[in-house]
Amino acid sequence: MQTSHYAAEKDMQDAAPRLTFTLRDEERLMMKIGVFVPIGNNGWLISTHAPQYMPTFELNKAIVQKAEHYHFDFALSMIKLRGFGGKTEFWDHNLESFTLMAGLAAVTSRIQIYATAATLTLPPAIVARMAATIDSISGGRFGVNLVTGWQKPEYEQMGIWPGDDYFSRRYDYLTEYVQVLRDLWGTGKSDFKGDFFTMNDCRVSPQPSVPMKVICAGQSDAGMAFSAQYADFNFCFGKGVNTPTAFAPTAARMKQAAEQTGRDVGSYVLFMVIADETDDAARTKWEHYKAGADEEALSWLTEQSQKDTRSGTDTNVRQMADPTSASAFNH
């Protein structure tokens, strides 16, 4: 589950005496409910009519502590290194994922915590050590979301974009990356040799106290195959308005891919929740947000999504740019 903005936190506080949401044990085994925290400005609504706010630690702490209070299972932060611009400067202002989640790990006690690694920016040995550190802070409640990187300007601005051939090789890169992580988390040592990484008696200690959970967001065939082999969970996107099962074909593809590897890989589905006292009030709020859609920022996202011409039509970013997805608007 994905919160849309800080107003959702206020809605949760206002509604607190009336919330009686529980899951039976057998339901909890089948379903996990989490919050995708607003690490970037304005959360998840690309609209001039939505609340405009900056990301802060205090904001994210309040949301994650409230989620933990109501027995949510996990909190996850993305990573974004350059935003979409527009009138709202959407995601032009962002916190950093690992340091944010380390702080949140220290002020929570039960909820699972996930940070996102932009793998082009961080060597796997550094991610392995940071993850082990947050595992220690959290008491074994930490996991890592691995992203290959799709938004070229994020990396060009730092001089580290490897060239457009990377679009077709990014899961080869990520495969080597996760193999190094597995070595270091599992044995504390890696001598991995590959096309992208060369480890020479690389050491990480202490190791995580529990097996490290890995999330990916593969939507392409290559992404699904990677998740089937290496991930514990794979993200997919909810679509439409009040169509909660529209993601089912994507989840079915993931299940089929996992059957080929003999692994159990769950699907995490991203939904944007627009909440109010009644369905009609929520619909009115949604229409108000939609009327203020930041077309400039949305156009920039669509333009960037078309830069990758080598990974197929079902990539993660193209799902994001789909106007029926959880992070955009139905035009």
Curated annotation (Swiss-Prot):
- KW Oxidoreductase (keyword) present: yes
What EC number(s) does the entry state? 1.14.99.46
Alphabetized GO MF terms: alkanesulfonate monooxygenase activity; uracil oxygenase activity
State where FMN binds: 79-80, 145, 154, 170-171, 220
Tell me the SUPFAM superfamilies matching this sequence: Bacterial luciferase-like
**Description of what induces expression:** Up-regulated by the nitrogen regulatory protein C (NtrC also called GlnG) and repressed by RutR.
Q: What top-tier enzyme class does this entry carry? A: oxidoreductase
Q: Which reaction does it catalyse?
A: uracil + FMNH2 + NADH + O2 = (Z)-3-ureidoacrylate + FMN + NAD(+) + H2O + H(+); thymine + FMNH2 + NADH + O2 = (Z)-2-methylureidoacrylate + FMN + NAD(+) + H2O + H(+)
- For bias type Polar residues, the affected ranges are 312-331
Name the Pfam families on file. Answer: Bac_luciferase
What ranges does the record give for the region Disordered, renumbered to this chain?
Answer: 300-331
Q: Does the keyword NADP apply?
A: yes
The record's section on Gene3D superfamilies has: Luciferase-like domain (3.20.20.30)
Query: Per its database record, what is this protein's job?
Result: The FMN-N(5)-oxide reacts spontaneously with NADH to produce FMN. Requires the flavin reductase RutF to regenerate FMN in vivo.
What is the official name of this protein in its record? Pyrimidine monooxygenase RutA
- Specify the species: Escherichia coli O7:K1 (strain IAI39 / ExPEC)
The encoding gene is rutA
